Curated annotation (Swiss-Prot):
Observed phenotype of the null mutant: Increases frequency of mitochondrial genome loss. Cells show a slight decrease of succinate dehydrogenase (SDH). Cells lacking BOL1 and BOL3 display defects in a subset of mitochondrial [4Fe-4S] enzymes.
Domain of life: Eukaryota
Family: Belongs to the BolA/IbaG family.
Gene3D superfamilies in the cross-refs: Phosphatidylinositol 3-kinase Catalytic Subunit, Chain A, domain 1
InterPro entries for the chain: BolA (IPR002634), BolA-like_sf (IPR036065), Mt_Fe-S_assembly_factor (IPR052275)
Gene Ontology terms: biological process: intracellular iron ion homeostasis; iron-sulfur cluster assembly; protein maturation
Any further remark recorded for this protein: Present with 259 molecules/cell in log phase SD medium.
Protein name: BolA-like protein 3
Length: 118
């Protein structure tokens, strides 16, 4: 089907829904973009309690703040099972988690070799 030129001219780029991967969504490029207030609040809580080597928090809900992916490496996890590590993070974020739809949590024990980053 061929569209008439007048119809093609009336379609504006702002009405096109670009795939997320092409728009630089936070899901793919969060380290290059500023953190949302919620991401910053979560990061601050985790840094205060766990003093992590690595602490990455991403809003993976498309920006509505209902689902987060958290990747954290801390010395405070040394000697703890994976379940205990997750329970510790859940305890720190208990009040926040109650408002969320979901959480993707990755925890790792510190090797003591990595630079601090967030």
């Amino acid at each position: 089907m061929k569209l008439p030129q007048t119809m093609l001219r009336s379609i504006s780029v702002k009405h096109v829904r670009w795939p997320r991967i092409l728009t630089g969504s936070k899901l793919w490029y969060s380290t290059q973009m500023a953190m949302t207030p919620e991401e910053k609040m979560i990061t601050d809580k985790l840094q205060q309690e766990l003093e992590p080597e690595v602490c990455k928090v991403q809003d993976v809900s498309g920006g509505c703040g209902s689902m987060f992916a958290i990747n954290i490496t801390s010395k405070k996890f040394n000697g703890l099972s994976l379940i205990k590590q997750h329970q510790l993070v859940n305890r720190i974020l208990r009040d926040d988690i109650s408002r969320w739809h979901g959480l993707q949590l990755t925890t790792k024990k510190s090797t003591g070799k990595g630079p601090a980053s967030s």
